[in-house]
A protein has these predicted regions:
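Active-site-adjacent helix/loop patches that line small-molecule binding or acyl-intermediate pockets
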Residues: 2-52, 59-87, 127, 131-134
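A penicillin-recognizing enzyme superfamily signal
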Residues: 1, 20, 24, 71-169
């Protein structure tokens, strides 16, 4: 069986550039990019970035995984994958517990930061971060309200928009 792929707006954007496509969360270019890069290559990179559970439960989402369909995701891992992109493509393990103390207050175990593992070319990570931090990249679909107001002095901020299957939010 096939599927009827469409963008959240219901419109087709034949001349959208990569910046506009990613910034506006266009589905058709996302699926085409996954097709070109290959499902296995893309999934391996996604896992290396920290989204280790995505499509890891015997799920076979095929090209629909490009738009988040067909696979379970752990949001903490998904956020870590984006953090890896923000670190210039370098992965770091998640840290859920920073230290453990006994009843006397003595530290019996303490988390230690480990060196990051480079999994994506820093230039590629920079380009992705640049797109995700560019509010003008989200304007293709008329999302002028999606400026998000991220203004943290001295901090480069980025975000990724998206919609649910029913395009409600």
């Amino acid at each position: 069986g096939g599927c009827s792929l469409r963008n959240a707006s219901g419109r087709f954007y034949p001349n959208a550039h990569i910046r506009q496509s990613l910034g506006s969360s266009l589905n058709i270019p996302a699926v085409k990019a996954l097709y070109i890069n290959g499902i296995e290559n893309s999934l391996e990179t996604l896992h290396q970035l920290g989204d280790v559970s995505y499509c890891s439960y015997g799920e076979t989402a095929g090209l629909s995984m490009a738009i988040g369909s067909g696979c379970r995701v752990k949001m903490v891992e998904h956020a870590n994958a984006y953090a890896s992109i923000a670190r210039g493509g370098a992965y770091k393990d998640l840290a859920y517990v920073l230290e453990v103390k006994n009843s006397s207050g003595d530290i019996i175990e303490k988390w230690e930061d480990k060196p990051a593992k480079q999994v994506v070319d820093p230039q590629v990570a920079y380009m992705i971060s640049s797109i995700l931090s560019d509010p003008t990249a989200r304007r293709l679909m008329g999302w002028t309200g999606y400026e998000f107001g991220f203004d943290v002095p001295g901090v480069w901020t980025a975000c990724k928009t998206g919609t649910t299957t029913t395009a409600v939010n």
